[in-house]
Amino acid sequence: MDTPFIITLDGPAGVGKSTLAKRLADRFEIAYLDTGAMFRGTAWKLGEGAWDWDADKLDQALKGLEFTLSGSGSNSTLSLNGTHLTDEIRTETVGMWASNMAKIPAVREYQKIAQRAIGETTSLIAEGRDMGTVIFPQAPCKFFLDADLEERAHRRFEQLKDMGKPADMAELIEQIAARDDQDRNRKVAPLKPAEDSIIVDTTHLDINGVFDKLVFETEKKVN
């Protein structure tokens, strides 16, 4: 494809975005861009409290960050300053740090520029919270996934268990609810579907059913 083909996949935590985005990337042989990992990586790299830094200090720190995306499908690799981002950014604590960072206009502007730069040269599926509304508004194929809070917490619990990490269901529900509130009510790029997004409630759907629907809708755009 001469012009990069972009698929956007937005939604709150725990709706299955990562799993589905990787499968779609494999299916269509394009790169997988986890923009949530970019926010998490930024928060992890700068550390706790970076959201309270003065504008000049934060600006200088952001200028020192460089994200690169290599590979395709589920083998896509996102790196920050040459370091592959892995499990160290996947804790709930770093997730809350990332949400705090995401409220800062300068951080969102930096991320927007970095993400668009990747999309200018690479066909990809971009997973995040404002991909269809802000980052890639002209993308031909946009999806917004949602699910009940309890179901999302259960999925996160199982994910953490598979990673060998301790988790408490009540605590996860509280953390995800707080994250939802931050994401949906922030002044800059709040979490919401684009007007032309295809909205899919995954609460009572298995992953294969959702995947088949996304493939069907994407193939209509590709063809």
From Swiss-Prot:
It is found in: Cytoplasm. Keywords: ATP-binding, Cytoplasm, Kinase, Nucleotide-binding, Transferase. InterPro entries: Cytidylate_kin, Cytidylate_kinase_dom, P-loop_NTPase. The keyword Cytoplasm applies. ATP binds at G11, P12, A13, G14, V15, G16, K17, S18, T19. The lineage of its organism: Bacteria, Pseudomonadati, Thermodesulfobacteriota, Desulfovibrionia, Desulfovibrionales. CDD domains: CMPK. Its main location: cytoplasm. Its EC number is 2.7.4.25. This is Cytidylate kinase. GO terms for cellular component: cytoplasm. One of its GO terms (biological process) is pyrimidine nucleotide metabolic process. The gene is cmk. Belongs to the cytidylate kinase family. Type 1 subfamily. It comes from Maridesulfovibrio salexigens (strain ATCC 14822 / DSM 2638 / NCIMB 8403 / VKM B-1763) (Desulfovibrio salexigens). HAMAP family: Cytidyl_kinase_type1.
